[in-house]
Structures are given as structure tokens and as C-alpha cells.
């Protein structure tokens, strides 16, 4: 049977707020629901269900002309917190580092802060972008730029960096490395919905979690939740 699905962007926080306001049937989230959001749902008498539908690797990206090929988690933390400000400090050219980030309502912003910055704050002068496409465009046009995007959005316009969390073993952001867990910056992606609307959202959820749906997820550059 056919179904009409309307998708609106804005970030995880926007989606969950829309779900709590009952202006959407499903909130797509790139982070787990926050305690404060759970409390709002409880106060409104809403019973929210969480369904992991895929996993996503976050790629650290720079301008294609940047000679740097890899960074450690600590180096990334120092860059995004403003402690390292010149590419020369991490083996690159003598060029100022321009940091691009997602806006605070983004689940991607939250996850990168949690996984890479260990919940420390981003530098105040980082440039917040409203969407992944804006980060890709800005990084592709700025020689000293660095940012982060979901693996599915990686394009030849930008260069990805290999990352190491132990300072010894580096892995490039590829689907294969994300699946075999050698690449460290990987997060679950969720669908949230109100249980009272289960009958409305069930057909879409059933399809997403089916073999056909998970095949589309993998072909789109994401990691399926079900092993083939």
C-alpha cells in the first residue's frame, strides 16, 4: 500500500519538540532523548517509544588541499575547543584553523560534543551551521576549515580524516570500518513516536526495519541495525 510521508528538517531537538507538541507523528533523532524531554512528555501524558533504525558514522572533514591525513581524538578536542588554532600545530601548513559546527539544536552537535569533546564546550568562536549541507559548502570553500558530517553526506568536494581514539590505531570513516567497529565515531539513529499513534506509524517502521528497508539504509551510506 502507498503512504505519503512528509519530512521536515531542523535537527533532533526540533523534531522531538514537534513530537511533544503533537505536530508530527515521528521524530527522527541522531541522539537519545534527553531527561528533560522525557519529563516534558510525562507531564503531557505522552508515552514515547524509541526505535533504533540505523547507525551513522560521523566523518571529520577538511578542505581537499589540506595535507593533514589523520588526527587523534585529543587533537580534535583541542581544535574544536580552541586550544589548537593553527594547522601547523598538528602537522599541517601554517594556516589558521576555521571551525565549523552544527547548531545547538542538532543531535549531531550533541553527539560530537559527547564522543569527541568528552562533554566539554565547543570554542565560542566556532561557526554554527543550520544543516550538514552548509558545513560541506563552507568547508569546501575555506582552505583552513574543519567540520563534521554524517558519512552518507561525504562528497569529493571535501576531504575526510582518519581518526584515532588511542593515539595508535587510525581508521578512515568508511562504511566497512564503521560496521567492523574500527572507526570510533559512530552513533545510533532513532525514530521516536507516541505509542497512542502506533497504528499510524507502524507501516513505516515495519518497512524501515524490514530487509528491504535496511538494504536502502546501507545503500544510502548508513549502517543497518540488522546484520544481513
Give the ranges of each region predicted by the language model.
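Exported/periplasmic ABC-transporter solute-binding proteins
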Residues: 1-228
Amino acid at each position: 500500500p502507498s503512504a505519503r510521508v512528509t519530512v521536515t528538517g531542523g535537527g533532533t531537538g526540533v523534531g522531538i519538540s514537534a513530537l511533544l507538541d503533537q505536530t508530527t507523528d515521528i521524530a527522527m533523532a541522531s541522539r537519545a532523548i534527553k531527561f528533560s524531554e522525557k519529563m516534558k512528555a510525562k507531564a503531557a501524558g505522552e508515552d514515547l517509544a524509541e526505535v533504533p533504525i540505523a547507525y551513522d558514522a560521523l566523518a571529520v572533514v577538511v578542505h581537499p588541499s589540506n595535507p593533514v591525513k589523520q588526527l587523534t581524538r585529543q587533537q580534535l578536542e583541542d581544535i574544536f575547543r580552541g586550544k589548537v588554532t593553527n594547522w601547523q600545530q598538528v602537522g599541517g601548513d601554517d594556516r589558521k584553523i576555521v571551525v565549523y559546527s552544527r547548531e545547538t539544536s542538532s543531535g549531531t552537535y550533541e553527539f560530537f560534543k559527547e564522543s569527541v569533546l568528552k562533554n566539554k564546550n565547543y570554542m565560542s568562536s566556532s561557526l554554527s551551521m543550520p544543516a550538514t549541507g552548509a558545513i560541506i559548502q563552507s568547508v569546501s570553500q575555506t582552505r583552513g576549515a574543519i567540520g563534521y558530517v554524517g558519512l552518507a553526506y561525504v562528497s569529493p568536494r571535501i576531504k575526510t580524516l582518519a581518526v584515532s581514539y588511542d593515539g595508535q590505531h587510525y581508521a578512515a570513516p568508511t562504511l566497512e570500518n564503521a560496521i567492523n567497529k574500527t572507526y570510533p565515531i559512530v552513533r545510533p539513529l532513532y525514530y521516536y513516536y507516541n505509542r497512542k499513534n502506533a497504528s499510524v506509524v507502524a507501516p513505516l517502521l515495519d518497512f524501515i526495519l524490514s530487509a528491504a528497508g535496511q538494504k536502502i539504509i546501507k545503500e544510502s551510506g548508513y549502517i543497518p541495525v540488522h546484520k544481513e
